Amino acid sequence: MNDSPIISVVLPFLIKDNDDKSLNYQGINNLIISIDSIIEQTFKEWELILVDDGSNNEILEQLLSKRYSTDNRIKFIINKENKGIVKSLNDAILNHCSPTSKYIARMDSDDISHPTRLQSQLKYLQSNETIDILGCPIKMFNNNKLIEILNNNNNNNNINNNVKELINIINNEESFKFIQHPDKDILMWSMFFNCCIVHPSVIFKRSIFTIEHCYEENNQFPFIEDYLFWLKSLIMKGLNISNIQSSTPLLYLRKHNNSISFKNIEKQKDSTANASCYYLNILFKRFNIDSEIIQNSSLSMKEIIQFFQLSPSSLSKINNISIELFEFAFKYLELIEKSCTKQQPNYSNSIKDAANEKMGELVSLCLSNYPNNQKSSLLWEKWLSRNPTSQLLSLLSNLNVKSSTTIINNNINNNNNNNNNNNNNNNNNNNNNNNNNNNNNSILNFISGINSNKINTPKSNNNKFKENGIRIICFSKDRAFQLKEYLRTFFKYLKNDDNGNDKFEIIVDVLFTYSNEKFKNSYQLVIESFPQVNFIKEENFTDQLINLVQKTNKLEYVMFSVDDILYYNEFNLKEYCLSLNSEPLALGFYMKLNKNITYCHTCNQDITIPLNSNTISRTENNFKYLKWNRNDNDCKKDWNYPWDLCSTIYRCNDIDSIINGIVKYYGIRNGINHPNRFEFNGNRPIIQKQIYQNKPYCLCLSDHYSPMSVVTINRVQDVYDNPIYDQTLSLDDLDQLLYSNKSLNDEKYKENSLSLNFKSVHIGELFIS
């Protein structure tokens, strides 16, 4: 029994009988799965408040009572009459939460929470104390498709009540959509176009929810009680809202035709546009922003907002968009940007980047529709004057327009010359690429996937001007101890066999960030211990990453790393790069893999070494490596994860092309603004065979052991709560190890590796010395 819960999970439900008066077994089963997903949380200090909002079903009540009555963490509230979602939520939160509860988490009756959802969200809130409301990544799954998969497995009854098995199936189904909404930097900006925080994924501070600030029933804005609460929290209360940025979904959202949101989708869209206009007008008045240009137009604010609510693919299919709509939409974006910047000045740079991206999409479509119109060219000039990033310029240079192409390319080249006077070679390459890409699709086509069969592998800059060597880029957040161990063992086991005649340069960079002053001080200790390393405080991940990889990198190869990697066997980066150089059809050299990797911890299942793998011996010094084709059917999980940040070596020109591919498909803001997203979005277009099918091969060591492992003693984004995590440490625990002068016992890890005890890339054993 938990008498002092920290989190109150509120789950309202209404389950009616089927149309033929039979019991709604599907609805009941979905509810049970939803409840069980909370019971199976790794974080245990919770209470679950179940609100039956007028089901009036004795069989249902008896079933739930029999199944859950012995769990004192679960409370039942039964409304004999249907009160509606707003009154049910307000009553549960204001009147039925335990006094000790500090946070409120939402849950819906047909969704599934990942086992680490509450733990991950609480950890984030405790590390980011200024955040008041927090969402998380979700994966949206179609209920009919899931039932079809279960039926095909011939074990429907066994799986349908098993939370982890269901999550496993949903994660492995590529047709189910992963959704990652923006973080605090641009959440307000994004909120005016569409609701970008998923209600059942939310956890918020209990202290912000009062009689004066709660969910509202508003006839002016029906069916969007959550969206209204977010807007009111942001604009009227000045609260901070964010979403966890991770490639791991923490909530699985079920979509089916019987859901309230599905039945009222058009009304919700209309209410969303009305509410957006209402709160934007509040901001315009608050900051004396002159919106007369919009008010005097033939288009209403609502019409322009509804224009922005359409997806890029939908917009690209509309042939009769007037040039005036493009003009007013651009001006409206300027007003929204100005109001958001006034409301949240700390995020002004991120808001500007997001505005540039949306304006870029608008200008792209305008030029495609009106290639010979002077107003289109003026819009382009206006957007260009905002100094958008070179990546956005590069995308828009690929517009499929006629007479505007020369204007665009000239302006891009002029802008590049003005901003990058020292990069003449790069500008010349860009000019050539721009001239060769006039027939490519626009940014909107890349984003929406239209005509994907016409999308070619992105062109990359030639590596012939790069110098012989490798740049190591390690990412770290709040884990100074693990970063110290990464660097200590990296230099301990790095073999340097330069003979002076064939210099191989190695540069090590660390891009790090921290959430509080304590961790900042810890990083300072690490910085002082490794003067040979370039430490860079993360301020803008996207810009800094591109600067390291593309703008300032002079070396031929790049290896990405994360701070929880530990090296324990000797390794030779030069040999690995030479092996990659000898295999032009290979994408990367994967230091984490070896012939003993036969288990994938993230999906909790055994995997096999690719049957087509061959041991290759280089003639120079008989160095041996393993080579396999990742496109073969038996290449699963770790053996088909081409874009990887765990000590994988890539050619610099391939990295350029993959980054360009990420931006084309997912946008610069959403594509590469975080290490997890950078890795996840890099894999999606490769695995889905949209890019890089001309390099299907992968390389690794031919031995049965690797020089390193990912030591997950403090996990960040893992999918499954496997037994290897029994000794998981908190960030504070790790920091204490740093100040106690402790180290990971790399000799012990080496001993286990040579004994072939490590069958997974990720290991959870904790050996301290």
Swiss-Prot record:
Changing D509N: 39-60% decrease in both Gal- and Fuc-transferase activities. The record marks D654 as: Important for Fuc-transferase activity. It catalyses: an N-acetyl-beta-D-glucosaminyl derivative + UDP-alpha-D-galactose = a beta-D-galactosyl-(1->3)-N-acetyl-beta-D-glucosaminyl derivative + UDP + H(+); a beta-D-galactosyl-(1->3)-N-acetyl-beta-D-glucosaminyl derivative + GDP-beta-L-fucose = an alpha-L-Fuc-(1->2)-beta-D-Gal-(1->3)-beta-D-GlcNAc derivative + GDP + H(+). Its EC number is 2.4.1.-, 2.4.1.69. This is Bifunctional glycosyltransferase pgtA. One of its GO terms (cellular component) is cytoplasm. It comes from Dictyostelium discoideum. Residues 25-210 are annotated as: N-acetylgalactosamine 3-beta-galactosyltransferase. The record marks D509 as: Important for Gal- and Fuc-transferase activities. GO terms for molecular function: alpha-(1,2)-fucosyltransferase activity; fucosyltransferase activity; galactoside 2-alpha-L-fucosyltransferase activity; glycoprotein-N-acetylgalactosamine 3-beta-galactosyltransferase activity; N-acetyl-beta-D-glucosaminide beta-(1,3)-galactosyltransferase activity. Changing D497N: Slight decrease in Gal-transferase activity. Residues 410-441 have a biased composition (Low complexity). SUPFAM superfamilies: Nucleotide-diphospho-sugar transferases (SSF53448). Signal peptide: none annotated. Belongs to the glycosyltransferase 2 family. Residues 410-442 are annotated as: Disordered. Bifunctional protein composed of 2 glycosyltransferase domains involved in glycosylating skp1. The N-terminal part catalyzes the transfer of a galactose residue to GlcNAc-skp1 in a beta 1-3 linkage. The C-terminal part catalyzes the transfer of a fucose residue to Gal-GlcNAc-skp1 in an alpha 1-2 linkage. Keywords: Glycosyltransferase, Transferase. The keyword Membrane does not apply. Residues 442-769 are annotated as: Alpha-1,2-fucosyltransferase. The record marks D53, D226 as: Important for Gal-transferase activity. InterPro entries: Glyco_trans_2-like, Glycosyltransf_2, Nucleotide-diphossugar_trans. GO terms for biological process: SCF complex assembly.
